Each structure stands twice: as structure tokens, then as C-alpha cells.
Amino acid sequence: AENEKIKIDFNLEQQKTNDLSKDKQALNEKITGAAVLKAYKITALAYKSKGVEKEKETDKAARTDKIKVCFTVSENKLVSSGYKRFFVRIARPDNVILTRGPAYTFQFLGQTLQFSAMETLNYEGDAADVCTYFEHPVNGAEMVKGKYFVNIFTEDREIGQTTFELK
């Protein structure tokens, strides 16, 4: 009888251990899912350079030679600290990606994508402001009139997007 009780107790404890393991795995999956960065307060503005260190905001495609993209990276204490690279892709209305050349690529979910600008941030878990520029190369794809799409990526995730219009 005592031997039977020990078997029952053992089976109950084994079931508790299995349940705890499942709970732990579910929590780890939730933490992993929550340990992501997000971008907010995203702005994209077109500029015309006016000499050294001077620029003027414009909404005209023909005058644009620089696009400034700014965003705030969310606070998230679950994300590991360290240097994070943020890739900005700017697509013209015809879906041509603005880039400075064929070497401007990054890996995203197993694909090689072109980027327009990249910025590195030493992320420490706190919200942080990031600004980066796409400077239009002399021989690059022309700026055209219409709606441009801006997407921001880091660590195999798209973390934000916005649009802007040039006339």
C-alpha cells in the first residue's frame, strides 16, 4: 500500500514538473515575443542643400537632394543592450528603392534588400531618438512626383513606416 502511494505521489510530482516546464516554455515565448523594438514618431522630410551645412525643407521632387528620416526607438528593457543597426528603405511611388549603390544591402528574413540609409545606435533599453539622411547621388534614380514609402528595419523585423509626398 505504501509502495502504491509512493508511485501515485511520484506520478503527481512528475505531472507538476511537466506542467511547470510547459509554463516556463510559454513564458519564454512571451518574453521573446515582447523583446522587440518599435519605432514611433517617424518623420521623413525632403531637403534642398544650400551650400555647406545649410539645407532648406522642400516638397518639390525636382529640388530634393536629401531626405531626412527621424524616429524614436521604443523603450524596452527586455531587449538586450548593445549596438543596433537600423536600416531605412525609401521607395519612390513606382517602388524603385532610393539607394547610393548596389553595395547598400542588408539581410532581412533570408532575403537581400537594398537600403537608403543606415544608422547605428548603442541601445541601452531606453527610448532613443535616431535621425539619418539619404543623400541623393548625382547619378542616382531621379526623384519623381508622388507618394514615397519609408520602412525601418532592425534585427530581422520591420519596426515602423511612414509616407511623404513630393510635388
Short names for language-model regions:
Residues 4-167:
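Membrane-proximal structural modules of membrane-associated proteins and complexes
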